[in-house]
Amino acid sequence: MTFPINKIYFLKLFSIIFFAFLANCPIFSQSRDIIVTKDYNNLTWEAFVQKAEHELQINIYYKIEEFPSFTIQISQNTLLSSLLADHLNKFGYQIAFDKNNNVFISKETINTTVISDFFENFIVDQSNTKLENEQQISSNFIQTNDEFIAREIIVGSKKQGLNKSKAIVSGYIKDAITKKPISGATIALSDLSFGAVTDDEGHFSFQLDKGKHNMTVSYIGSKKEKIEVNVLSDGSFELFLEDEAILLNEAVISANKYDKVKGTEMGIEKITTKSIKEIPLVMGEKDIIKVALLLPGIQTVGEGSSGFNVRGSPTDQNLFYINSLPIYNTSHLAGFFSSFNSDVIDEFTLYKSNIPVKFGGRLSSIFEITAKQGNKERYTSSGGISPITGRVLFEGPIKKNTSSFIIGLRSTYSDWLLKLAKNPDIKESSANFGDAVANFTFNLGNKDQINLFSYYSYDQMDLAKRTNYNYKNIGSSLVWKHLFNNVNSHDLSIVQSIYNFSEESNDIAVASYTHSNKLEHTEIKSSFNINNIKDHKINFGLNSILYQVYRGKYEPLSLESLIDSKDLGKEKGIESALFISDEWTLSPKLSVSAGLRYNLFTYLGAQDVNVYLDNLPKISTNIIDTLHFKNNEIIKSYGGLDYRIAANYMFNKDFSIKLSYNRQHQYIYMLSNSIAISPDYKWKLSDYNTKPIVGDQYAAGLYFNTFWGGHTYDLSIEGYYKDAQNIVEIKDGANLIMNEFSEQSTLQGKMDAYGVELMIKKNTGKLNGWFNYTYSKTSNKIDSEFPENKINFGIPYPSNYDKPHALNLVTSYRFKRRLSVSGNVVYSTGRPITYPTAIYYQNGFKTLHYSKRNEYRIPDYFRVDLSISIEGNLKKNKLAHGSWTFSVYNLTGRKNAYSVYFRYEEGKINGYKLSIFGSPIVSLTYNFKLGNYAN
């Protein structure tokens, strides 16, 4: 276990002032007779430390910058103390052991005795007061003059703990520099073999026996904190983590090993902004959504397409939240870029199975994005410039240590690239996008926090001055968080999100038109967290969503146009839910979680509704009545119970098995004629004639942490089966743009999907990254006794996004602290397609005969990316820090097929392949920020 120089001063930890009598001699204080076997022979020192810490359950502390390089030589089993002395004394090092299996190596005097009563000033009571001297306690040891002493934290008081054997211990984990809360930090209690993970506010809590406990606090990219907690009564404390500067730009996926092995969660991935710094991306733009595509079970139909498919489900079964605000279009330029500026994102959590009960309304996945909070200490700024985008971020305190703001802006200047094209249509086109994020945080005392978040994004695309697309996302969320005590809390959120789309087409003057639609999502949610019941974590609450869908206006664009005006009006629906869940630790090895969510969806007027003959196709000739409903009159109600059940059994601390079952209801879906999400897609509510979608998912997984070759690895394998009833498919040849009665253009049926996902991740060393492989199959079945209500003759067919095989390899190699190289290798099976297979003549007319639905596939997809990152100097005192990233997207220049289309030419059918990126895309990006690399 090594630390960079800004945290290593603890090597003076047993001061010359207090312990001068021990100077200039090797010390083995309270040494343990740990046996080291011949298996350690010929290991480098770094590999020896990794292996020893993992297998011998010890922690070795030393100063890496000045440490010599050598190989361990051991011919027979020997004591650890003797082995270290033989190899290190000749370099002038002294070694000490303490009672907690910590090994200290230093050229300075060492003692491991803690002065009694030294920590009296660090007692923490129930009032959530901060520990004194934050600058001092941000490391593993507290400094007094030149002395460092292993730290103990006392929680509560003896008086408050009288007649009690247990106590509730809670606290907050924060960044040592910015003082921002750290979400997803792990608090592990080694003596009890369990732990906790901090929530969005950096808060944690658990019940402990009174007495002393060894606690380890860790987080991606931060230095690990090891402390001894002396629990006297109920109490709380704050702990500050510093950045682990030695792991420069290390790419990390998932929160930490405790989430994977110890929690009941399945199908969950956490992505931090550190994960995307070195991932090579098109045009040099950081993109957290593109990084998500490198995870197992996540696919897209092709480059330049919006949305993606999770475990075989369509794109409309995913829901994105950023700070509780739903976003209904997550892309810029029709899918080339994400609509989320990665500079303002703190972390991104993906739930693809065992979705928390507080979320509902989507069958496949929930993407929960957390925006950064502003710096409460000082004002700062950062930004970057790439070939087609520029971005800037501002943050700072509104009131120091109490409230803060952060504002991120991003825009494009891509038209110059289009002007370079030889094709006149492209040369006359234009494309622009931008987005803005503002996040304001206010702490109202120790128990209340208010967060105000706003988001705006826009896109404008003019295609050869003939067709113009405009679409916008705009919304705000207000979240109030209240702590009742150290362990129980309440969250209240109020949000509104609006998605606007408009299209203008003047390709043909007499048929020129303008078309627009809009979706409004207004939501209120109240959620309670109860953690003061032993071995239980309870969450319950309610939420309600008002959907208002402006289905579309269709109007002539000019006086020459012969298009008739048409307004489809507005539809409304209210989706409400009550939910409760409990995570129950039955034993140190077995934990279960269960939840219920009751949904009620009400479809409201004003609306005219067709009534069709029972059990007959929904076509105009089968209409027997039309019902007229007034404004806010109930047209139709649907209800259902969602289930969440999961269990985790730990065979040991590094190996577990998990099982889970989910049921979900979905009351809103997407209407689109294209395979990929195009800007002109429309959202539609379940109504009188269209039932809600209901889905079940079953999953099982094995999770491992292992140590091999001096490095740690995380391994997981998950299998799943999911089915959905009442999925919506579009009839062949249906016109969706201004269809007043969508049930006449759609059919409902069944979806089945199953698959296996394998993930291997290397966490340590100069070379790190991950590899994953996914095998999956997805099929749809639309059957009926009536031919017009069948697709593919009622026979199951592969879904449009079915890709059985997919693998991703992501690697990063750090040559030096300032230089790193990373690369991706991406492969997937081509998606299904329906081919014309023959020409036949009917009544003298040529007719094409097509294959079965999605019987064939386009060519397989393969791509290699590469990037080189160079950091500026790592001086501590500097005005600003800069870095350069050179990246190549599609290094091999492979012409991956986005689609295959056919033309009838000279009496035969010719097939053509359309590629989005048929050559390498090279980019150079400059990033800057005020301050040094660490802050």
Task: Briefly describe each language-model feature range.
Residues 720-723, 742-837, 927:
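Gram-negative outer-membrane beta-barrel transporters
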Residues 726, 730, 818-821, 826-845, ...:
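C-terminal beta-signal and adjacent terminal beta-strands/loops
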Residues 49, 56, 91, 107-166, ...:
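Short, acidic, small-residue-rich periplasmic hinge/interaction motif at the N-terminus
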Residues 192-203, 636, 640:
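Short, acidic Ser/Thr/Gly-rich low-complexity loop/linker segments typical of extracellular
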Residues 495, 650, 658-662, 668, ...:
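Membrane-embedded beta-barrel scaffold of Gram-negative outer-membrane proteins
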Residues 131-160, 197, 221-223, 235, ...:
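Periplasmic N-terminal accessory/gating domains of Gram-negative outer-membrane beta-barrel systems
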Residues 388-411, 424-460, 468-492, 496, ...:
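Transmembrane beta-barrel wall of Gram-negative outer-membrane proteins
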Residues 541-654, 785:
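Signature of Gram-negative outer-membrane beta-barrel scaffolds
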